[in-house]
Amino acid sequence: MAYIREMVSEDLPAVTWLEEKSFTVPWSEDLILDALESPLDRMWVLVEDEYIAGYCNFRVIAGEGELMRIAVAPEARGQGYGRKLMEHLEKDAGDHQVEDITLEVRASNEAAIGLYKSRGFQVEAVRKRYYTHPVEDAFIMWRRRS
């Protein structure tokens, strides 16, 4: 059974691998470590059978939350792990009185956009040609509770 726990430094190789498999411009191990050590960031891993199948990075600044990264291993997609990670960060946000959460997503990432919409997020802006490799627009999505 899958469970979620706080990320620890020993998870860096697995999370770096998830980054490389999930993003065209992955974060380096150093960037991930910086986030892990930041007092503004919360990071969790989703573990299935002692294997890290997903992770997310949630940042809180001035009372607002931002989903910085979320990734699920390619072979573990379609099992609801992204939803479980989102539910976990939403509960954490509520526990810390964070009502509004934002994120950015590639305009072509239909699976992620569908997940975010199912969690109450709406597209509020578009950043034209924001992403590289390939060049693509970003949707800025918000879930506002305030």
Which stretches of residues belong to each language-model region?
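Short amphipathic helical patch at the helix-1/turn junction of helix-turn-helix
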Residues: V72, R106-A107
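Short glycine/proline-centered loop/turn elements that form peptide/ligand docking sites
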Residues: M86, N109-A112, R129-P134
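Divalent-cation-assisted or electrostatically stabilized phosphate/pyrophosphate-binding catalytic cores
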Residues: M141
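Conserved hydrophobic beta-strand within the GNAT/NAT acetyltransferase core sheet
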Residues: L67, I101-V105
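Conserved catalytic-core motifs of GNAT/GCN5-like acyltransferases
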Residues: E104, K117, Q122-A138
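Acetyl-CoA-dependent GNAT
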Residues: A2-E75, Q79, R83-H88, D92, ...
